[in-house]
Every structure is written in structure tokens, then in C-alpha cells.
Amino acid sequence: MTHVILGHCCKDASCIQVCPQNCIRPTPAEPEFDTVEHLYIDPGACIDCSACVQACPAGAIRPDSALSGSERLYARRTRDFFADLPTARQRGPVRLGLPRAFPQADRPLRLAVVGAGAAAMYTVRELLQRSSSIRITVFEQQAEVGGLLRTAVSWNHQGIRDMVRLFDIPFSDDRVETRMNVRVGADVSIAALQREFDVVVLAFGASRSRAIGVPRIPGMHQAITLLSAANDAVRHGTQARLLRGPKALIVGGGNVALDVAAAIARRRIVTRAGEPIAQVAVVARSSVRRPSFTMSALHELTELDIDLTIARDGAPPDVGSADPVQRLFAELAEDRRPTVDTRKLPVTLWFGNEVTSLHSVGGRIRLETTAKRTFTADSVVNATGFASTAVAGVPFAEDGVVSNRRGRVVSPDTGASIDGLYVVGWAKRGAHGGVGDNRRCAAETVDRIVADIERIRSDPRRAATSAYGRGHAGGQG
């Protein structure tokens, strides 16, 4: 019997570290790691030791004999992956290496981490592993740690939601203090933190929706608001009565757009009158040949009680494609039969339609696209992606991320590094990648801090004792 990694794999790579057979691929050192949706266990090498099951923080690994009918897809994907992988690389050694520690110093290193989401958690954990005397203060504007992991991940992704428990050990360490309900940039400035700490790490994520059309148009909603409301509704056994019906239009083509469609299909998001939405259209800028969502997100949507249509504009399905999404498209086209089941929610995916205008007409919303199409709906959900909120004293690039080179914050004017200021997570690389991607991202940023720290601490301007560094208490406060 072998084990299979499912689609909600977080790519934390903890499983790779504990596997005695080195049979989990790709590793973080391999080029495919950045592009695969999830990791794979070689069915010809797995010895059923279950070490990976215990190590997986997302609960995404199961014995193949325990897979449900819909999960068998991942066993097939695993076989396909290793069939295409060169034999020489299937069982090669895994080179993880030991992280470089902070050099010894005459006083503890003081760091501020801005934000308390997944990127911050992995950063704090990485920092604690590099020094026994380090002192870390985490500043968070909300009342709880966890960020979008706590508020926006669907209840159907319970394995991912359970990753909140990873905060427990690092954030309760005696070397870590948390300061909740503090807005950096408003309650305390970046400049003040730079004066008080040796290093400031920006981990505030990207939770601001990218703008489309006219702001505050009646019937417009942000995806993050709806998903958070849906989670609250599930927690309280109710429904999120937010939309105008009967038709909803979701603008955006990533996993978040499909998450909103799934929440509507599950009737967690309904009309203000409590009625289910009767029709959903997802309007994506990406092409049907290169959609932005993952195969797992699409597969999850197809498992719901919906009637899914892929609007292809006459283009035939790519039957021979190696891309898993295109394969699923082809399977859906082959299996599709005319339906008269009015109980199923009609969901149509439109591709190649970038929004050019959006306005209110007669109480409804009209949307026009680059493909010369016009869509009309009662509610529109903006799921076009996220950007970081600007913070005074932090340089931002045009794409909405903090100006940086591999975690070192740089001046956009000169390109020079700003000593003592670093960034991690979505604020560093943009709003893409899952929870576990932050682990490698955090390690890269901390590597830069370790490399720079002696130069930073030799700066006489940073030699004063920090008010934040005195009387340092552990735990959440």
C-alpha cells in the first residue's frame, strides 16, 4: 500500500524531511517545485511508514486504499507525474542542509515582525531556530493571529484551516511577544520601529482587493468580504445574506473566484431575502488554454450540485494536453449531457474577457469586456486578486508589492537596500502561492537577515537600547 497527496497539499515540505525513502517529489531544490500544484509520493518506493502523514500540517496525505471516489483522481495524477519524471531523479538524494545561525553577540538581537499571518508565523519559527537569545515582537492590527488563514479559508478546506495550530508553539515561546490591535503606519510608524529594533520584517500580506469599475456601486462586493462572511455563517449555523439575485457575476479567474462560486453553490452565500442564487457566471481575463485556477479548485467545484459550462467560443477541448486542468476540461466536455435538472445551479466559466467598463443600469450591473461581450447581473463579486495596503515609510513597486530583492527591501529610486528592513510573504512576492509556500519564502528572507546582521548591528545609530527590547514578555498580550 502506498500513500497519496491530495489537492489541498500546502507545499510546506515537512513531509520531505521525514520520508526515509526520499520518495516525495519535487523537492524545494528542484525546478518543478515552484510550478506544481501539490507534491507527489512515488508509489513504487513508498513503504507505508506513515511518517509523512504525521508530518503533514494540512492533513493532505492518505493511504491509497482509503481514497474516496473523487480523490482517486490524485492517485492517477501521481502515476502520471512519475511516469513523466526522469528515472535518475525519482530516487535521488534530498539535500536540505542546515540553516545558517545568527552569529553570537554581546546583546540579544531584537526584531519586529509586522503582521501575524502565515508568512509571519513561518518567519518567527525560522528566526527562533537560528538563535537561542533572539527577541521578537510581533505587531498585528487584528485581535487574533492567523490572518487570511483564519478568516478566509473555506470550512471545506479544514486541513488548511487546521494549520492555525502551527502558530501555537512559536507564538508562545518566551522569546516572542505579540502586540495585538496595533496598526503599524498609524499607531506606530515604520521609522519608530526601525529606531527601536535591529531588524523590521514586513509580513502584512495582501488583503486589499484590486479595484475594478466604479467604487461603491450598488450590488458590488469584494470576494474576501463574502468568504469571511460565509465562514462566520457556517460557524453560527446561518447563511450570509448579502447578494442581490437571482444572477451573480464573479470577476476573476483564480482559485478565489471558484471558492466564491462554490460557497454560492453550497448556499452559504445567498440573497438578502435568503433565497439561493439562481445563476452564476465567472468572467476571467486569462485564456481557456491557460486558466489561473488550479485543477484541485476546479475539481472541487465539479463535485458540487452544479451544471458547469466551459464557454470555449468554438475552440475544441485539448484532449491530448499534459496540463491537468485541460485534461479535466476534456473529461467534462466528454461527459457533458444536456440537463433539465432545475435543481442544479448553472455556472458558466468565461475566458479571455478583461473588464473594460462596469456601471449600474436600471438597478442591475452591466459589465463590458475586451472580447466585446456585455454581461448583466444583479450582483458582481470582485475576485480579481489582492494587493498590499500602502504603509507610510515602505517603498512599493507598481505591481503592489514591497520593492525588494529576495526579501531585502530596496529603494525604488536607487535600488539600494534599506538596512534593517525586510519583507516576506505576499507583500514580498505578490498574492500567489499557498500557506506552505511561505515556509521557503521566510527561509530566504531570514537567510538575508543572517548575512546582513553584523553590518547592521555595527551601525552606531542602532546601538541605543530599545524601549521595546526591555521587559520582554512571552506569549500573546
Where are these regions (language model features)?
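FAD-site-proximal beta/loop scaffold in flavoenzymes
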Residues: I16, F33, P218-T238, L242-R244, ...
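N-terminal Rossmann-like FAD-binding beta1-loop-alpha1 element of flavoenzymes
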Residues: L109-S133, A257-R266
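Dinucleotide-binding/catalytic capping subdomain of oxidoreductase cores
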Residues: R135-V138, V145, T151-A152, I160-M163, ...
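Conserved beta-strand-loop-beta-strand element in the redox core of flavoprotein oxidoreductases
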Residues: R183-V200, L358-T374
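C-terminal, flexible cofactor-proximal segment of oxidoreductases
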Residues: R408-G477
